[in-house]
A protein has these predicted regions:
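Short beta-strand or tight-loop elements
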Residues: 2, 19-21, 68
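NAD(P)H dinucleotide-binding glycine-rich loop of Rossmann-like/cofactor-binding domains
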Residues: 89-149
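Short structural boundary motif marking the start of a folded domain
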Residues: 2-7, 33
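Short glycine/threonine/proline-enriched tight-turn/helix- or strand-capping micro-motif at secondary-structure
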Residues: 14-24, 53
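Short polar catalytic/cofactor-binding loops
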Residues: 10-14, 40-42
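Cytochrome P450 core scaffold surrounding the K-helix E-X-X-R motif
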Residues: 45-51
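Glycine-rich beta-strand-centered segment in the early N-terminal region that forms part
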Residues: 26-42, 53-93, 116
Length: 149
């Protein structure tokens, strides 16, 4: 068990309340990977979740942060080892699963990708979900044989 800080959003009679609280890794959801978050990014969905707007987050209290990059501190998956640097974007992270605005996240292994060579956690989160989505689109177009002409 490790204690850590997290941005916390709670529903109230007047809307939502925000605070930074101390949590325990024991309180995180099930998953094969425990990741110490180095960086997260700011996405429009995070703002919607933090404001309590419907359609993004159904389960409160909650920690937003749909992107996270960091280092694995525990793994029960053979594809990942302690010390691996990873990126986690998408799926349910930061929506209904404790997100990157906490110092730790626990996620299913299939939500994570190993940090590509030449990229670090800070750079990965500067790019964020929007940048990764655009890069995946360009990659697929190139795989289909399109040439820049």
């Amino acid at each position: 068990m490790t204690n850590f800080k997290a941005f916390w959003v709670e529903k109230t009679d007047d809307g939502v309340a925000h605070s930074v609280i101390e949590r325990s890794t024991d309180d995180l959801p099930e998953g094969e990977l425990l990741v110490k978050v180095a960086y997260s990014s700011l996405n429009y969905k995070d703002a919607m979740s933090a404001k309590g707007l419907p359609g993004v987050t159904r389960n409160y209290p909650h920690t937003p942060g749909i992107d996270a990059a960091g280092v694995i501190v525990e793994s029960t998956d053979s594809g990942f080892a302690e010390g691996d640097e990873v990126i986690v974007i998408g799926y349910d992270l930061g929506m209904n699963t404790a997100g990157g605005y906490g110092q730790y996240i626990r996620v299913p292994a299939n939500w994570a990708v190993k940090m590509p060579a030449g990229l670090d956690a800070r750079e990965a989160m500067i790019i964020g979900t929007a940048g990764f989505t655009a890069a995946l689109c360009v990659d697929k177009i190139e795989q289909m044989g399109a040439q820049p002409s």
